[in-house]
Amino acid sequence: NTGKECHLDANLINKALRKLDLNTIDLLFIENVGNLICPAEFDLGAHKRIVVVSVTEGEHMVVKHPYIFLASDIAVINKIDLAEAMGVDPDKLCRDAEKIKPSIKVVKVSVKQGSGIEEVIKALDL
């Protein structure tokens, strides 16, 4: 529970981690709450930071929220199977992310089609 805050912070993560047997965990994903603005400024102590945007959110999502992309190591452009129906160019989203942060790894994904998952795993260095 984040209380009145719109995001998780390192203190909340630390409290949660104390309740887990970390010897039984090989990989832990933490999904911050809120939108792409609020959690961008808060470092949770992660080894890698991933931002996920969907083509259904429109072509403007990356340029509208540059800070989360600056703070991230990997950008996942999700639901690319819906791009044509939405009139969105996923390559534009990729270019925008790379323009904001040239070192970001960008992966196009369609979970429905099963594409891009291996690339995400590779980007995570797993």
Model-flagged regions — what are they?
Residues N1-H47, S115:
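Nucleotide-state-sensitive switch-loop elements of NTP-binding domains
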Residues G3, D9, K19-L22, F29, ...:
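TRAFAC-class small GTPase G-domain
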Residues L8-N11, P39-D43, M61-H65, G87-V88, ...:
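Short, well-ordered secondary-structure micro-motifs
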Residues R18-D21, I37-E41, S54, D81, ...:
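Signal for well-folded cores of large energy- and translation-related assemblies
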Residues N32, P39-E57, H65-I77:
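Inter-motif core of Ras-like GTPase G domains
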Residues G34-L36, T56-H60, I80-A83, K112-S115:
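Conserved nucleotide-binding/hydrolysis micro-motifs of P-loop NTPases
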Residues I74, L82-L126:
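Canonical P-loop GTPase G-domain recognition
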